Amino acid sequence: MKYSDKHNIDPDLIAAVIWQESGGNPDAYSRSGAVGLMQVMPRDGLAAEFQCKNGPCFAGRPTIADLQDPEFNIKYGIKMLKRLYDHYGDYRSALRAYGPMDVGWSYADKILNIYSNYGD
C-alpha cells in the first residue's frame, strides 16, 4: 500500500481498520453517513447535520462523491489516522479518536486485535 508506506503506517494496520470499518466493502455506508472502505465522514449528506462548537463538524472533509473512490478513501483515511497518531503518540489512542465517538477504547482494541492476527 503506497499510501501507508508514505505515512509510515503498517499496511496490515490499515487492512485491520478497513476490515473493522467496512468489512472490505468499498460501497459501505453507515447509519451516521460515513462512506467507503475506511468509513470517513464526508462534509455533505447526513454528516452535514453534525454540529460542533464552531459550526459543522466535517466542513473541511471531502464529499461523498470523493470518498466513493476506494483509492481516495484509503488515502484520506490514512492521512487522518497519521494526524491522530502524530497528535496522540500511539496507535491505540489514535484509533480511539478515529472511531465513532460513543465507542471508546473497545473500538481501538478490536482493531488492534484484528491487526495482531494478520500474518498468522
List each model region and its residues.
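Catalytic glycan-binding domains that act on GlcNAc-containing polysaccharides
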Residues: 1-120
